[in-house]
Amino acid sequence: MSTKEKLIGHVMKEEPIGSRNKVTVVGVGMVGMASAVSILLKDLCDELALVDVMEDKLKGEAMDLQHGSLFLKTHKIVADKDYSVTANSRVVVVTAGARQQEGESRLNLVQRNVNIFKFIIPNIVKYSPNCILMVVSNPVDILTYVAWKLSGFPRHRVIGSGTNLDSARFRHIMGEKLHLHPSSCHGWIVGEHGDSSVPVWSGVNVAGVSLQTLNPKMGAEGDSENWKAVHKMVVDGAYEVIKLKGYTSWAIGMSVADLVESIVKNCTKCTQCPRWSRGMHGVKDEVFLSVPCVLGNSGLTDVIHMTLKPEEEKQLVKSAETLWGVQKELTL
């Protein structure tokens, strides 16, 4: 008898039930690993699978996490370039793709990443046909649409990280300006995750107090407090981080974990993810835009009907047109 057989006596004759909350992260770059670590630290899965085409880096990252498993509640961390390792995942997070370069807009990345998705998405579907598919790769709104088309999944099971991070940046900067914790500052960024995103100034509030009621010019030209600069800082934030450290990672990783938590814990929490938006607020094209929605264990279950001012609605339509201008040229 082996040491293991002498030590452990089996009670069950059949094989134990496998993972119930398996999460896969595709891509072990900076964003992928920040997402993986954030998911592990929040104890959101009982098994974590990592996939990448770069075998040495993949093996090294997996070993590094495994060596720290004593300090985590998730000890089963697996990795392989073969997608069979992802089988029966509850959530699959796709971070793989070409990295955004300094000064490069997210939309310029699109065709390079579409070609990568043509390999990734069918493999995910093959091994986890019932998963919730979460796209993080940029440009995330267009690639969420691409993932939906390539997967054949119903719309509620294909989401993106969207403007969840944009809104977090917005609330952080607002908090800095008001000397309050971001959780006390409420405001939404909708539309594209990127340059044409739309701040919903009419909904910005602290403790239910509308800031635009206190300052009717908030977010507009002629505002002596220049709140419009807050949104500019949100848009420029990623570019500034890339300029300073070469890439973004930690904030988007934490944002991804926040979305995964809403799914695996069935939080039914309001967040903002790209969803199919034709017919909403005057949007005419088949695009995915971030709007307030509800995430639970079935995916994106509900959408919140925002009350937008005419100018905000106009900006949202323009954001949709910006995405459609690129999306309609794609070869899927």
Swiss-Prot record:
It comes from the Eukaryota. Pathway: Fermentation; pyruvate fermentation to lactate; (S)-lactate from pyruvate: step 1/1. It is found in: Cytoplasm. The active site is at 193 (proton acceptor). NAD(+) binds at residues 29-57, 99, 138. One of its GO terms (molecular function) is L-lactate dehydrogenase activity. One of its GO terms (biological process) is lactate metabolic process. Keywords: Cytoplasm, NAD, Oxidoreductase. Substrate binds at residues 106, 138, 169, 248. SUPFAM superfamilies: LDH C-terminal domain-like, NAD(P)-binding Rossmann-fold domains. It is an enzyme of class 1 (oxidoreductase). It catalyses: (S)-lactate + NAD(+) = pyruvate + NADH + H(+). Its EC number is 1.1.1.27. GO terms for cellular component: cytoplasm. Interconverts simultaneously and stereospecifically pyruvate and lactate with concomitant interconversion of NADH and NAD(+). Belongs to the LDH/MDH superfamily. LDH family. Homotetramer. This is L-lactate dehydrogenase A chain.
